[in-house]
Amino acid sequence: VQDEIINKPKRMGHHMMAPLYFTALVKSGVLQVQEADDKKVAGILDLSNSMYYAHHHSLTIIQRGEAEALALASEGGTLLIDERTLRFMIETPQDLMSLLQFRMRRDVTMNEEKRKLFQKYCDNISIIRSSEIVAVAYEKGILSKYFEGEKREVLEACLYSLKSRGCSLSTDDIDDYLRMLG
């Protein structure tokens, strides 16, 4: 994960700011870098990237950083995932198959045996999304300490900001949050 968040982006001009920020968080002790078990990571990569097939070819679904995060969280932790593909793979693998079929415009099959084995890695993981953290911050009044404006407007702005930064939130999801909380 450190490689994907800090090391690789440092070499790409338009992504250089985030690695500087995360490096500072690690140095100050706010974030900790942990090493994942290589065997567990390899097992997760093997299963996840041989679970779905299109035209008799396996589909690469996750990368090493995601597998490392899963390996670390598989011991009863919580995993923050904004990326739809991995979240669907963990929570609703059948929906991921449908999404892949839609995106690829071809039939996709799922190896049920590998899905069951993969699911064993995920049984003890609690999944949360950034939008859920924003919702809790809104409910507890934390957002109003940092942002000026009407409460509902601040919530909406935060949710759209997450969406524009890669959180897999649809406009319907945002409307649902606003209806429930605003």
Provide a role label for each language-model segment:
Residues V1-G77, R84-G182:
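Active-site-proximal, substrate-binding regions of enzyme catalytic domains
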